[in-house]
Amino acid sequence: MTLSELRVDVVILTCAISAGIHGALVREHFDDGAGLGAGFVVATVLLAALAVALTRRPTQLVLASAALVFAGLLASYALAVTTGLPVLHPERETVDGLALFTKAIEAIGLALVATLLRRPALPVAFLQAKGTPT
């Protein structure tokens, strides 16, 4: 197993853990509002789909999608605890241990995905081959 394969496996694990936690909290968040509950359903479905897609074929598109979902979840939680989410949950959410654990898992997933995304190589035109006149 290569280091890249291990990183993909950990990203799959982070997607699965986060999907499980979001799925377990759906009912509780539907009690707070339909929009908030629906958001947790969407997060669960997206994370589960990413875990499956990464297991089957971890393409750059799937990795970029995982990065987007993780970043979105982290940003939405930051908004939820600082200002609230307009329309969905205008009151500020209280910070709790499970939420912090989930966000730590998602941050690990995001950091690992960032290392797996390919960056285009920059052409280096100013270098000359060894032994050629300058």
Where are these regions (language model features)?
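Membrane-interface extramembranous regions
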Residues: 1-134
